[in-house]
Amino acid sequence: MEVLGKQKVLAMMKLNGAGQLTGYPFETPSSSTTTPSVPPSFPHSSNPNAYMKPSPPSAISSPPSTSSCSSASEKKECAVCKNPNSSGYHFGCIACAACSAFFRRTVVLSRRYYCRRDPVGNSLCPLDRRHRSNCRACRYVRCIDMGMNPSSVQNLRDSIKPRSPAEMIQEAEEEDKKEKLDDILFSAATPGSWISSTSTCNEPLPVAPKEIPGENYIETLAALYKNSVERRRMFYCNGSLREMLGGTGLKMRPTRFDERYYKEKMRFELVLYVEMMNSMSVFRQMDLDTKETLVKGCAVSLAMLEKYYISVKYDGLRTQKLIAPDGSYTDLSDHGAQFDDEFTQITESVMDKETCLKLLYDPLRSCLNELGSALEHSRMTDTEFCALFAILLFNTAADNLSDASRNAVVMARNRVMKDWFEFYAKQGIDPHEAGLLVGNTLLLLTAVRNAMAVHRENFHVIRVFNVMEYDKLIDDLAFT
């Protein structure tokens, strides 16, 4: 056993009336299990603490007595996670077995963590008995702040023969799984826990998705969205082969009254969105139920957002034209003049033109002015659209998500935020300006939600009064 300095020994242990060492065990960089011997008595002095440095809470603070002996046997809470059942001093501070094992694994395996809540590195995540496994980066920072010393950790401690890196990693993963299971069982019986009280051991443990080195979600989405625009141009091109191959831009044309919900158009657009979602490894790794829940909750919102984004991009806010991805537009400034011929040809219309315009098109004008103005003010580009695409996809408030799936969605959204800032940094954008761009983009969510409510009411009128035929797939997208 390594001989510790006199001041450190007294700061970590207590002396009872008989001169025997009592209190909490402490770890030293040694594999020896022998009981430490009683240190030699110190010279008498009128002030026994004169040569001592300030001590931690367990240091000598009063003359030995019966009460002090009884308090020495009481448990102290872990300095890291506030677990009341600490196991003593570990690597320099009072800690529980779980936190000391976590610290040892981190140092031995040379692990590096980052906080998904704050990529800058500030420790913002809650750290207590229930949430200590949520963010390893903040947990390790807390360990260091509380006094744990990485140099006190010995590699291959208590090992008879050298272990391979694969064996060490496997052992660490098993310990992580046991700790998470212990946290789940604790949280199931604790009020206010983020885990449902109905959680059982059979429920899948929340695990961090496997990450591909160098993958940036925003960069991937932006590249794929650019390809999707080109695919749309070729798919919706009604011209010659030369026009299709020549890269002619988006052609504007007035839309038909009943064209908005064509079957072929809706399914093609949904395929493009799913391709963008599958480009992110975190989405591909999710189970089918989670994917279905997330897509149902965001598909219509994404289609609506992109329509207004395209409208602003092609000056639709000034001309009061709502432009679809295929180039068809609805002129909201002519009071439905573009549909005069269609209304005259309909012999058994369920409602007259004035009523139809009042219920269906006047609300769209309000949405264009509100959401379109917000998009223009935020200076949205393809980058911000793709970032908002991912934010809407990874909706942590989505219904019918299990605890494990919801935790994976939270980690995915935090990863999106991190990659968003990193993408701006690669482009040489100042961090302050990047923060403004991110903040202004996130503020659009309120306008998106308001516009979505109007479109939902709009479609409800169409469905109830059978104003036009629509693809029944939309009923499966949580739009009704």
Curated annotation (Swiss-Prot):
Top-rank taxon, per record: Eukaryota
Biased composition annotated in UniProt, kind: Low complexity: 25-36
Entry keywords, A to Z: DNA-binding, Metal-binding, Nucleus, Receptor, Transcription, Transcription regulation, Zinc, Zinc-finger
Compartments, record wording: Nucleus
Sequence ranges assigned to domain NR LBD in this UniProt record: 233-480
Source lineage: Eukaryota, Metazoa, Ecdysozoa, Nematoda, Chromadorea
Role according to the record: Ligand-activated transcription factor. Involved in modulating serotonin-mediated induction of adipose triglyceride lipase atgl-1, thereby regulating body fat.
Region described as AF-2: spans on this chain: 470-480
Zinc finger (NR C4-type): 78-99, 115-138
GO molecular function: nuclear receptor activity; RNA polymerase II cis-regulatory region sequence-specific DNA binding; zinc ion binding
GO biological process, one term: cell differentiation
Annotated family: Belongs to the nuclear hormone receptor family.
Encoding gene, per UniProt annotation: nhr-76
Tissues expressing this chain: Expressed in the intestine.
Inactivation phenotype: RNAi-mediated knockdown abrogates the increase in adipose triglyceride lipase atgl-1 expression seen in serotonin-treated animals.
Protein's UniProt name: Nuclear hormone receptor family member nhr-76
Region: Disordered, residue numbers: 24-66
Organism: Caenorhabditis elegans
DNA-binding region(s), chain positions: 75-155
